[in-house]
């Protein structure tokens, strides 16, 4: 089993953690002007990929 030889310093751990970030969801605008999440159904019209769901 892999065990660290030395303790990881606070600075080194913080530098590694800088890459742990969340991305904001990017909604898309439909043809009727409403906003929805990509690959999701439009909740106002009930359509998904131009077909009624």
UniProtKB/Swiss-Prot annotation:
Region: Disordered, residue numbers: 1-53
Membrane spanning residue stretches: none
Domain of life: Bacteria
Residue ranges, compositional bias (Basic residues): 1-20
GO cellular component, one term: large ribosomal subunit
GO molecular function: structural constituent of ribosome
GO biological process: translation
InterPro entries per UniProt: Ribosomal_bL32 (IPR002677), Ribosomal_bL32_bact (IPR044957), Ribosomal_zn-bd (IPR011332)
The keyword rRNA-binding belongs to this UniProt entry's keyword annotation: no
Protein family according to the UniProt entry: Belongs to the bacterial ribosomal protein bL32 family.
UniProt protein name: Large ribosomal subunit protein bL32
Naturally occurring in which organism (per UniProt): Sulfurovum sp. (strain NBC37-1)
Lineage: Bacteria, Pseudomonadati, Campylobacterota, Epsilonproteobacteria, Campylobacterales
């Amino acid at each position: 089993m892999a065990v660290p030889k030395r303790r990881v310093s606070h600075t080194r751990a913080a530098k590694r953690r800088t890459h742990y970030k969340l991305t904001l969801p990017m909604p898309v605008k439909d043809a009727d002007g409403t906003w929805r999440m990509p690959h999701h159904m439009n909740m106002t019209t009930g359509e998904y990929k131009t077909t009624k769901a």
